[in-house]
C-alpha cells in the first residue's frame, strides 16, 4: 500500500533520534518522499555490477530472486558464463535497458527502481506498466 509506505518514509525523515538503514530497493521511495542528499544514495546494482549466490551455488541477478527459476548453476558452469549468457541475467538487463524511466531526471539516482518487484517502486511518475 503506497499510502502506508509514504507515511513511513515521511515519519522516518522527520525522526532524528534513530538511524534507519535502507536496502537499495528503497531508493525510489527515498528519492520521492525524503529530503536526502542524492550523492549519499546507492541504487540497485543487480545484474549491473552484482549478483547473489545462494548456499546451494545458484547465482541470481538479485537476492530477491532466490527461490525462483531465474538462476544459473555454478556447479555446472562458470560465474563468467552465467553472468554473460544466462537468460535470467540477459532478461534482467534487457528490462533495465528498456525502462520507461530512462528519460527521468532522477534516473541517475535510482536507475529505474526494481526490475523484479515493480510494486516496491515508489516513484512519483507511478508507471504501472514500468516493466
Question: What residues fall within each predicted segment?
Answer:
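Flexible mid-to-C-terminal extensions adjoining Fe-S/redox cofactors in radical SAM and related proteins
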Residues: 58-59, 64-131
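Radical SAM enzyme [4Fe-4S]-AdoMet core and its adjacent flexible, acidic
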Residues: 1-60, 64-74
Amino acid at each position: 500500500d503506497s499510502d502506508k509506505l509514504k507515511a513511513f518514509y515521511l515519519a522516518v525523515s522527520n525522526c532524528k533520534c534513530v538511524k534507519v538503514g535502507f536496502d537499495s530497493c528503497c531508493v525510489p521511495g527515498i528519492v520521492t518522499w525524503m529530503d536526502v542528499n542524492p550523492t549519499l544514495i546507492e541504487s540497485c546494482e543487480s545484474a549491473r555490477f552484482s549478483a547473489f549466490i545462494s548456499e546451494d551455488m545458484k547465482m541470481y541477478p538479485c537476492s530477491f530472486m532466490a527461490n525462483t527459476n531465474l538462476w544459473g548453476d555454478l556447479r555446472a558452469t562458470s560465474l563468467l558464463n552465467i553472468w554473460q549468457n544466462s537468460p535470467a541475467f540477459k532478461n534482467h538487463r534487457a528490462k533495465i535497458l528498456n525502462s520507461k524511466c530512462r528519460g527521468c531526471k532522477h534516473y541517475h539516482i535510482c536507475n529505474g527502481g526494481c526490475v523484479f518487484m515493480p510494486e516496491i517502486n515508489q516513484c512519483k511518475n507511478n508507471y504501472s506498466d514500468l516493466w
